């Protein structure tokens, strides 16, 4: 089976929901790109992408060009609260996502709650839980011994409000604790400022 995946290098969702599954799936030919060149339009059985892609303007034309089934993955809810960093952009994107759900030959989701939401638009949906290939490459468990109890959180700047929820409860923790955060990104001033706020809220009085 030949599967082409669409994502871009800065997408964490694309990495975990498109790239990793294709990298570790048995008995397939997988290819991942952010743009399908003319020489890569033939011989595909499945096109898979997360949420949106540049070819979702006209699905009839895209399916005719590639001649394959389309699998859309959606790993989180697209109806965002007003205080979410991506709220404004998703006001326009929501309808696009719902159209993509309806047009897909199959939709994969991460959990039952999301499946229930997606089934409002299609009955061709299944749960594919998040997973990591533990024991391989960067996912090898190399534990550094410590006398501290380490609390680990990993995510992106889109979770700033989630960290705010944790801020006060974390202040009540006592003992020999070390706070560890993963995903830090200082690629631009805005992203860095959000991460610095998140780190301050998460670590609080505890060493990091």
Give residue ranges: language-model regions.
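Donor nucleotide-sugar binding/catalytic pocket of nucleotide-sugar-dependent glycosyltransferases
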Residues: 103-140, 150
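Short, well-ordered alpha-helix to beta-strand connector turns
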Residues: 43-46, 67-68, 74, 103-105, ...
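Active-site proximal beta-strand in glycosyltransferases
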Residues: 63-81
